[in-house]
UniProtKB/Swiss-Prot annotation:
Residues 1-35 are cytoplasmic. This is FAS1 domain-containing protein SELMODRAFT_448915. One of its GO terms (cellular component) is plasma membrane. It is found in: Membrane. Residues 59-198 form the FAS1 domain. Glycans are attached at N118, N169, N176, N201, N236, N247. It is a single-pass membrane protein. PROSITE patterns: FAS1 (PS50213).
Length: 260
């Protein structure tokens, strides 16, 4: 599904402000543009462009939807410590665009290298937003979702589906979470490392990186912020699934993130 220019053009304008080329003239420049823009998704620098929010000047005001400056360095340090060095570099340079109270799904450096350099600019923008869940959640809470549960993303109308919730193989859209709770030191944001780029469109499916990591076992997860995702849907499309009792034999607890 393609989005209209209403949300596309404002984000392109912001990318220009950060010296990201958006009108390449050669094949080499197009390849550089695609990879440069795609790494933005790994640190959640997508703003809520569909509502026309302007970038805030005061970074310490958490009401403007931007990550406070005091949380940027812990975010960067967490990413470097887990090997997501591309994400860390972009977070450091584009810190005024990182949204708060969200969950970032960050592909590995190897996954970035495998991205098709010929993606259209609109596909790139949509892909950026598709890697940001609209609520912060720890891996422990995320892993309690039923298979088939749909999680809302910043790409309007597009969901990410839980495709496996077994203890040693938790996947979203068949993509493994290999590094849960990467950003455990931040107050407002959660992020989890994945081994492939998530494709909102089946024609954009990419392969895992050349040295993809195995799935991470759920029992190793560490604490991180969690909240009930307002738009999460269960397999039968029941709203607010945290109010349901789970029938799972694996656990008697709710299989959905618990509200704070």
């Amino acid at each position: 599904m393609r989005r209209t220019g209403r949300s596309y053009k404002p984000l392109l304008s912001q990318l220009k402000d950060h010296h990201i080329p958006v009108h390449p003239s050669s094949r080499a420049e197009r390849a550089m543009e695609s990879r440069t823009l795609l790494v933005l998704l790994f640190v959640g620098v997508v703003t809520i462009v569909s509502s026309g929010l302007e970038r805030a000047a005061a970074q310490d005001d958490t009401d403007d939807g931007i990550l406070p400056s005091s949380d940027v360095q812990p975010l960067v340090s967490n990413m470097i410590g887990q090997g997501f060095t591309v994400a860390a570099a972009v977070a450091q340079s584009l810190q005024t665009l990182i949204p708060i109270r969200s969950t970032l799904l960050i592909p590995s450096n190897n996954a970035i290298a495998g991205v098709d350099a010929n993606l259209s600019q609109e596909d790139i923008i949509n892909t950026l937003q598709y890697h940001v869940l609209t609520f912060p959640t720890s891996f422990e809470a995320l892993s309690r979702n039923d298979v088939g549960a749909e999680l809302p993303t910043m790409l309007q109308g597009e969901m990410i589906t839980v495709t496996s919730n077994s203890p040693g193989n938790f996947t979203l859209n068949e993509v493994n979470i290999t590094h849960p709770d990467v950003c455990s030191s931040t107050r407002f944001i959660a992020c989890h490392g994945i081994d492939r780029v998530l494709a909102y469109n089946s024609s954009l499916v990419t392969a895992a990186g050349p040295e993809a990591s195995p799935p991470f076992g759920a029992e190793q997860a560490s604490p991180a912020p969690e909240a009930l995702p307002p738009g999460t849907r269960s397999p039968n499309n029941t709203a607010n699934p945290s109010n349901r009792k789970s029938n799972s034999t694996r656990s008697s607890a709710s299989r959905y993130p618990v509200s704070e």
